[in-house]
Amino acid sequence: MTEKSSFFKVEPEGPLRIGLQEWETMDPKSLVSGNPIQRGHIYHEYPNLGYMTGVCDCTEFVEQMGPYQVDEFMLFLEGELFLDLPDGKTVHIKAGDAFIIPKGFECRWRQLGYVRKIFMIVDGDIPQARNPSLERITVVNLDKQKFDFDISNKDIQFLNAAGTMRVEVEQLCSLAQPPIKQIENKLVTVLEGSVVIGATEGETTFGTGETFYIKKGAEISMKTNLKTKMINVCYQMP
């Protein structure tokens, strides 16, 4: 069970023999159109902190324009989305895209068909912060830098106002890291190569396109081959 695991794979259709469960109905007052049916599975959460990570799917709907209620990272697995902005511009999201909407950002969710996504949500007060990533929808640029694969490198592309959530693209050369106690929760998607994650319960290899989750406080070892690239979505409790 993931509740007792130090790390685990995030399955696109939810855990084996559990799958995705139907969630409560959206408030009709928040919708312009649609009668969406949303299903999901929460893999890890801190309800008192407004934190959760998981996978969900949903049928089509269009929301009212308004401030986004949470900081949310999303990795789209299926479908497409249009995020309309007050200035008339639109951000187009499609399957394979990773993106972040910051809490309080004004936009309209316009989804014309079925979508499935992996997500991380962080809620809480919004402190004053001068961070450019709080003033836009950040679509993660997976090829922003052409790194030298002999050198490990991280490119931070989003930091929330509270400083508790960040999104980075990490590129690693060949690595063999001994067990280290983790100081944050981490949702990781392998973009290229593979990584071997180990803990007291054993080792698991994750390859290109797979997503896994590491819990804060776990003693985790890591091994990678040459040319491994990952998206790390990190949450550090306040």
Regions found by a protein language model. Give the residues of each.
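Short strand-coil-strand connectors
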Residues: 47-49, 86-87, 112, 161, ...
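Conserved short histidine dyad/triad with adjacent acidic residue
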Residues: 35-43, 49-68, 95, 103, ...
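Short hydrophobic/aromatic-rich beta-strand segments that constitute the beta-sheet cores
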Residues: 53, 83, 117-120, 197, ...
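Ligand-binding loop in jelly-roll beta-barrel domains
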Residues: 90, 103-127, 216-238
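Short acidic-glycine-tyrosine-enriched beta hairpin
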Residues: 87-103, 200-217
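Ordered, small/hydrophobic-rich secondary-structure cores
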Residues: 8, 13-98
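Short, conserved beta-strand element in jelly-roll/cupin
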Residues: 67-83, 181-199
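A short, N-terminal "cap"/entry segment at the start of jelly-roll beta-barrel domains
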Residues: 1-50, 123-168
